[in-house]
Amino acid sequence: YPLRRQRQMCIRDRYYINGVLQPAPAVTIGPPLVINGITVPAGGNAVIVYEAEVNPYAPLAATGNIVNIATITGGGITPIEVTETVVTDNEPLLNITKSISPVPVTENGTLTYTFLIQNTGNTAADAATAAEIIDTFDPILSNIAVSYNGTALAAGTDYTYNEATGLFATTAGRITVPAAAYTQDPATGNWIVTPGTGTLTVTGTI
């Protein structure tokens, strides 16, 4: 799976000889990426450092990997090929959004905080992940009812809430979110990410 440079340019592109920084070498983006004008002194070494991002064809599932192949060529030497395998980051990747309804809020009315949790990672956020949602409600709610994915949660067991301060926290590991699903577009070859989701709702009186 080819690498592409972020915004079509290296974030960092460093060239060292025996540990001493050198002027940037000539680079052809490609693919393949080609770096020319490298000098390796007798008994010494040269190091090239650059960053790149993977393209949309790279597999994202837990078993996915990218094999990066580099070939060293030059006058009077036999080409040398080296490989490095980069595996996927196998962990949950969570993000959360919060919304309030109804808007506008009426005094002494009922208010609902809704938290949408999305997991774009290839690994589920299970109980062992010990994920928590902690928030200080403003406005503060009283007589709250809490549910996750439509299932009622119990105060003290599944969450804690302080009506004096508005501090709300779910019990570590009570919120679980499935892994994302990955499908490959048959026309383009790009991988499409469908996040795993969970919805926490907290309803109470202002």
Predicted regions span which residues?
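Exported/extracytosolic protein signature
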Residues: R5-Q8, R12-I206
